[in-house]
């Protein structure tokens, strides 16, 4: 892992979290308890802060960044799939962001939502709570079922277990 100060600000990373080799975390980044940041992920808090809350997993090759005056906030119990990009946006609690998705500046993903693989959420779009969105640009498909909500939680639980198995 590579942790870098930016303009005198060092990332704040909980000792209960796991940052994997080749991940890069720079600047005004706060990572809470039991967060996993997997191989080759990059998290940059150089233009505004990045906050990632507990039990969240940032999978391989993700990019988390900000824009001037636009922070990035990722809530509790979130799965950010491989190679997803979250740029100056908010992801509320209990969400799954599919592989290769792109969440752009000012967008908000409401809690308990699922952004399908490869989906592009345009700037300033609001995804309502408990919603499935897919496509480029995103389209709201429907409310999530109870089974889908359980699967989001199971995915988060799986990554917590997986993180604990690495030394």
Regions found by a protein language model. Name each.
Residues 1-12, 46, 54, 60-61, ...:
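Glycine-rich hexapeptide-repeat left-handed beta-helix
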Residues 50, 71-72:
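Active-site cofactor/substrate anionic-group-binding motifs, chiefly glycine-
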Residues 66-68, 144:
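Short beta->alpha connector loops at strand-helix junctions that form conserved
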């Amino acid at each position: 892992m590579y942790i870098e100060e930016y303009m005198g600000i060092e990332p704040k990373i909980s000792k209960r979290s796991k940052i994997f080799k080749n991940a890069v975390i720079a600047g005004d980044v706060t990572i809470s308890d039991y967060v996993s940041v997997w191989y080759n992920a990059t998290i940059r808090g150089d233009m505004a802060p990045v906050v990632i809350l507990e039990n969240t997993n940032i999978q391989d090759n993700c990019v988390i960044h900000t824009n001037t005056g636009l922070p990035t906030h990722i809530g509790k119990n979130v799965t950010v799939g491989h190679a997803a990009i979250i740029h100056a946006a908010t992801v509320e609690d209990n969400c799954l962001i599919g592989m290769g998705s792109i969440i752009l500046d000012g967008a908000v993903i409401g809690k308990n939502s699922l952004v399908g693989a490869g989906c592009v959420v345009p700037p300033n779009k609001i995804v309502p709570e408990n919603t499935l969105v897919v496509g480029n640009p995103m389209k709201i498909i429907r409310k999530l079922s109870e089974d889908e909500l359980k699967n989001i939680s199971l995915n988060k639980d799986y990554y917590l277990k997986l993180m604990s198995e690495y030394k």
